[in-house]
Amino acid sequence: DDDGKTFTKTYYSEGGIVEFVELIDKNANRQPLIPTVIYCDGLDAASNVTVEVAMQYNAGYQEHIFSYVNNINTIEGGTHVAGFRRSITRVFKSYGEKQGMFDKAKVTIEGDDFREGISAIISVKVPEPQFEGQTKTKLGNSEVMGVVDTTLSRVLEAYLEENPRDAKTIIQKVILAAQARAAAKRARDMVQRKSVLVGGGLPGKLADCQSKDASQSELFLVEGDSAGGTAKQGRNREFQAVL
């Protein structure tokens, strides 16, 4: 201190990063989707890299990931975060496909869908960390990605097999995220397409179709508002447009 005396401060949390995940969700009023925080830890003998991960799905729509290397907050992420994302995408995708849940949903699943509503803490201990990025807060050690991926995947696979109800809840959330993303894209494409058509000088009374494939689309020309209304009601919106 200012007087030259040595003092120490000890910070201790009995629950560790599991309690950390619970705290950040509680402080943000995020409702847990599953009752348990999924936790894993491990030491890779070859690289001497230690991994700790705690993750929890909630009812929200955002991804909240906090990553650390040797207790340094890596705000730009890095290979440890990449390994985490690769693991949850691969493991949950494999489980959903094996259970046939994605086939029933008839929607394309992307990596972001698996991370919607997830809160996670990733903490690794690396003997010789290599930091990158503008502020040197991005981990660059390539070997860490595989260590995190392998360590987390082993625990996730066992968790899903042992907790089928939680697994189903998570996969259903993933599917809902994919469906919402696809619906938003369709709505955005329709608005942009109509803007282009109207801006190009086409009549405002064009009832466009949803298909973008001109070879599979049909355009019906009708005279009068009455006939136009009848045609719109009887058409197939997927590939039939009415003018």
Language model regions located:
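GHKL-family ATPase ATP-binding module
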Residues: 1-243
